[in-house]
Swiss-Prot record:
Homodimer. Coiled coil: none annotated. SUPFAM superfamilies: Adenine nucleotide alpha hydrolases-like. Pfam families: Usp (PF00582). It comes from Escherichia coli O6:H1 (strain CFT073 / ATCC 700928 / UPEC). Gene3D superfamilies: HUPs. This is Universal stress protein F. The lineage of its organism: Bacteria, Pseudomonadati, Pseudomonadota, Gammaproteobacteria, Enterobacterales. NCBIfam families: PRK15005.1. InterPro entries: Rossmann-like_a/b/a_fold, Universal_stress_UspA, UspA. Belongs to the universal stress protein A family.
Length: 144
């Protein structure tokens, strides 16, 4: 049975993506793993918290998802992986929730996630990587 690896990608942070490439490639070679890439678009309440109204200021969610998928596909080209083993997912909502949901659904044997170095804000507020580590039902590799 092939392993399944979930790789959440923040399309707005290329430095984080660079950090996981070698780890994903190495893990994917084991048992010819299937690799699922995921990016998450914040939901509309997030945009409202930035002071944007629910109006023409906000692009349609379908447009946001299409653009995110296009960007994710460009990022995936940096990984040396067989294309028939790569899957692309774009979701809306809380990153940690969508990561955990997809990990259960596919089901993932491992999640490889990049994380910023911890600072006071991550200790006070928590981070997506920390939440994934705490709640995932599979192994999680956090790359810093």
């Amino acid at each position: 049975m092939n392993r399944t690896i979930l790789v959440p990608i923040d399309i707005s942070d290329s430095e984080l993506t660079q950090r996981v490439i070698s780890h994903v490639e190495a893990e994917a070679k084991i048992d010819d793993a299937e690799v699922h890439f995921l990016t998450v678009i914040p939901s509309l309440p997030y945009y409202a918290s930035l002071g944007l109204a629910y109006s023409a200021e906000l692009p349609a969610m379908d447009d946001l998802k299409a653009e995110a998928k296009s960007q994710l596909e460009e990022i995936i080209k940096k990984f040396k992986l067989p294309t028939d083993r790569v899957h692309v997912h774009v979701e809306e909502g809380s990153p940690k929730d969508r990561i955990l949901e997809l990990a259960k659904k596919i089901p993932a044997h491992m999640i490889i996630i990049a994380s910023h170095r911890p600072d006071i804000t991550t200790y006070l507020l928590g981070s997506n990587a920390a939440a994934v580590v705490r709640h995932a039902e599979c192994s999680v590799l956090v790359v810093r």
